[in-house]
Amino acid sequence: MRTPPGRSHGHQDSTPGILRHALRVTVAMSSAVVALVTPAAAAGTAPHEPSYTDGAVRADALTAYAGATTAQARARIDAYWTPERMKLAGALVPEITPVPEDDDTPDDPRPLPPDTPDSGSVWTHGGSVEKNVGRLFFTFSDGYDGSCTATVVTGANRSTVVTAAHCLRGVGSPSADDTWNHNFYFVPGYRNGTKPLGGFTVRTMATSSRWDADPDTTESSDVAAAGYDTGLLVANPAAGGRPIADVTGSQRIGFGRPAEGEFVHAFGYPDYGLNDPGDKYVGSRMIHCAGPSHPGPRTPLLWGETCDMSAGSSGGPHLAGFDTRTGTGTVVGVTSTDEELAGGQGPALYATRFGADARRLYDWAQSR
């Protein structure tokens, strides 16, 4: 039985690397995976055949992988992610795990006052962010289901979705099919097992080739710390042919930000909080954090803010210049990992800064 990422499991990271003493990581599957992916055994099913038709293709410092490219594959994935299966995407043993109760926190139409710090609470204020941020579901190569968070961003193809690289694949050879996850299904605005704007399969995806590392010598926290934990997805259109951004709207994307101290808002779908590993969160509602950004430990390409989100929040957007009235801002990074601050203070959630590699991925996606 696997320990959920982010929970105390007795694992001490002794691998040399940038974050050896700073970040909590966990081993999931056969390779080390950055914390914050939510793993779960597939509900009563054996491992599935991948829905992909092509293997990995390496070009221009990125590694791309084909997704659901046929109508049959898209239909199978859509049928697979039932409301119950989505709700159980954080359970270790779905066969005996009660389906989580719905979160009935009431909506609040009033805008959140600007620059209000928040270490973790249900987002109830609506706006664009409630439509273009959602839960990204997938199946590991051994048949276990998992989930992350992802965001629709503005782009020429109107189909670009950004998340963390470790939500797409583990470190290792990009040509090895078992490093890639499968059955990708993005549900924007996910809420209590429902799909208010529908569900979207993925046509293709890519990570930086620098994310590809030797799993015998490198923890994925090392390459995350180097700023490469960014993944881009190109979503298939909705049933009527509309691109996803026409359905959900989109957030702007920015590169080379934020400045230290810049106020940033983070969103995600965690299964639990770092300080409260009980039933504080169950992945049913989108959680919000906000505060001034600060540098990550021992690397300029990780930065974060105080936030009590853990497994499931990976890939979630960190937005600068966020307008709490409209729910719009600029995505300047995605959640990569976490650190519990010293002295009993609240934990921090760290994002990978969008640098040259992230820009290359974004440009690649626009022609797909």
Q: Residue locations for each model-derived region?
A:
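Chymotrypsin/trypsin-fold serine protease catalytic domain
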Residues: A226-T230, V234-T306
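Secretory targeting and sorting signals
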Residues: M1-A46
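Protease-domain processing segments flanking chymotrypsin-fold serine proteases, especially trypsin-like
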Residues: R2-P4, P39, A43-G155
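Catalytic nucleophile loop of clan PA
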Residues: D308-V334
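Catalytic histidine site
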Residues: H125-N192, C289-P297, T306, A351
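Acidic glycine-/aspartate-rich tracts in secreted/extracellular proteins
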Residues: C167-L168, Y190-G193, P237-G240, D271-Y272, ...
